[in-house]
Amino acid sequence: PGHHVYNVLLERDLVRGKGWMEYCIYPLYSPQSLIAEGTANYGIELSFTDAERLNFEQQVLYPLAGLDPALAPRYAQLNALLAKLGYADNDIARQYLEGSITREEALEWLVNVRLYPAEKSAQRLQFYDAMGAYVINYNLGQDMAKAYVERQGGTRAEHWAAFRDLMSSPRVPSALLA
């Protein structure tokens, strides 16, 4: 599940199901993007336990990609550690976009704080230049979607029901806090 599924469900349930034509257009820079991108990222976590994901990547994806499956556990561990730095992107983007740090300082932060390679750091700045504050939709959106879904019940089935409802009903991000 991801933002494409989110848009398909909104179209099916709201546009076709209820005739709410205002949902046939989705402005990229809208509050819906936080939910769309957040549910896309959270959907991975909801779909697999950590062990299931590692097994799927190791047994299916790594061989398909021609990668050594023995590297999968270490890569998963690295990604878990790097995820803890995710909000550094938001902070760097904010400082850069408001002009309190220069492009060079932002690149330095991305390399030394966010731990991106230099090439990826330059790409991130291009993303900030093109998309502005959109970067928050990924990690903040994921955390808000996760917290909302998990408050709706304790079982995996209840989480999936809440997730599906979240992805197919009109919401604004502040509704995820309730």
Q: What are the functions of these language-model segments?
A:
Residues N7-Y29:
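Post-HEXXH active-site segment of zinc metalloproteases
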Residues C24-P31, Y75-N79, D91-L97, A130-Y134:
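Second-shell loop/turn segments in exported
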Residues E104-A178:
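C-terminal, non-catalytic "cap/extension" segments appended to globular domains
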Residues E37, Y42-R124:
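Long, amphipathic alpha-helical stalk/connector segments used for oligomerization, subunit docking
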Residues S30, L34, N79-G86, S100-I101, ...:
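Soluble non-cytosolic domains of exported or imported proteins
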Residues H4-L9, S47-A51, Q152:
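A generic secondary-structure signal for well-formed alpha-helical elements
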Residues P1-R12, E37-N41:
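Active-site recognition of the HExxH zinc-binding catalytic motif
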